[in-house]
Amino acid sequence: MPFSSSTNFDCLQIDLTGPIVKVFLTLKVMSCSDGHPVASSSIGISHNFSTPLCQVENAPTASEASRVLLAFTPTEFQHLSIVKATRAEGKRKKKAFVPLSVQASELATTAPDAPRLYSVLLSTPLKPGDATTLEVLYMLTHSLEPFPAEISQSESQLVYYRDSAVLLSPYHVLEQVTYIKMPSNRIESFTRVDPTTRAGSEVKYGTYSNQMPNSYLPVLVHYENNRPFAVVEELVRKVEISHWGNIQITEQYKLKHGGARHKGVFSRLEYQSRPSISGASSFKNLLARLPPRVHSVYYRDEIGNISSSHLRTDSHKSDLEIEPRYPLFGGWHCTFTIGYGLPLQDFVFESVDGRRYINLTFGCPLLDTVVDDLTVKVVLPEGSKNPEHVVPFVTEKHLETSYSYLDVVGRTTVVLKKKNVVGEHNVPFQVYYEFNPIFMLAEPLMLISAVLLFFVAFIAYLHMDLSIRKSS
C-alpha cells in the first residue's frame, strides 16, 4: 500500500544548463498517527548539486508501506523521459543505494488536468515505526522554451523555464524551500512568490509551511542559456551479427538544433573571427562515445565521406569527434551516417542454457543529445530462431526479416523502438537467440556449389559439338 502518511522533507534539484532538465528529488516522508499526510520540504533547482536524499518514515500506528507516490503535472508527464529511484541501506560509511522499481501508478486519474502519479516500489515494506532513505532522479525533455523564438548570429539565447515554487505532491508538506540555480548570472526576470530572494545566479523560494496535497504555485524564470540544443529527430541503429568474427553497426542520424531559430544571414567570417560572441548557442562538433576496440570507422553524409572527424581510443572507450559540413544554428538540420565494426568475441557470448546472446549499449552514442525517436535493429545470423530481448525499461518490439548477400530464408531481425531517449538510457541490453553452427556453412557451400556448377557447365560446353556441319 502507499503511504497514507506524510512527507516531512523534500528537496528538488533541477539542472537547467542544457536541453535536458535533470531533476534530483529529496524527500522526508512520515506517517501521522491520524493517517493524514504531513511533510516538510526543501527544493533545490540547480545545474550541479550534491546527491539528494529522501527520508521516509512510517509511524508506529500506520500499516506497512510498500510504495511512495510521485506526482507530475500533465505537461511534465508529456516530457518525462526517465524516472529512477534508489533506496539507502546501511549507515554512514557502509551505506549503499539499492535500485528500486518505478512504474506508473494505477491510482492515476484520467482527468486531463489531474496530476499523473508514479509509484516507487520499496524493496521491503516499511514496518510501523521504521524509516528509510530514497534518492529519485527524473528527466524532462523539450521543457525549455526559447524566447525570443528567433535570434541573429550575434545574439545570445534566452529561454523560459516554468515550474512551481512548491513541490507538487500527493502528501501534506509541512515545510519547503525551493532553490533555482541558473548556469549564469544573466537572469532577465523571475516570478516572485513571497518570500523570494536572489543571490547571484540563484533564486530562493520559501520557506513555505503547511502546504496542502497537490499545492501548486506557478513560477516563470527567463534566463540566458547558450548550451547547444542538439536534438536527434530520428536515429536508426542497425546491428548486424556475423559469427565469422565481426559485428557491423550502422547509425543513421537526422539531427537538428532545437534552440532559438536563426534569423538573418550567416557570416562565416564573423563566426570564425569572433567565436566567443558570434553564434554562441550554435555547435560545430559532436562527441560520440563508442565501445572499445572499434575498427573500420566511417562518417559520411548524402554527399560522401566527411574527413573532419577524430577518433581517440583506449582500453575502456572510443571517442569519435565529428564535425558537420557547416555549424548548426537554431532550426537548422543535417543528416549523416556513422558506421563501425566490433570484434565478435567482445559482445556475443554463450549462456548456460546453450543460447547465444549479444550484449550492447542501448541508446544514442552522441553525448548531450535528446533522441525523439530511436529504432534499434539487431540483425541475427541466418538460421537463428526464438529471439528474446532483455531491456531494463519499456520499449516497443516486433520482428521482421532482413535479406543480405547469399541469404536464402532471410535473417531474423529484432526491432526495438523508444521515444524521448536521453543519456541515462545508454545502459546494456541483451538479445538472446538459438543458433546451430551448421548454418555458418550455408553461404560457403552455396559459393562452392556455384563455382563447381560453373566449371561443370564450362567443361560440358567444351565437349559439346555445336557446329552445323559434321566433321569428316
Regions found by a protein language model. Name each.
Residues 1-472:
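Lumenal/extracellular ectodomains and adaptor appendage modules
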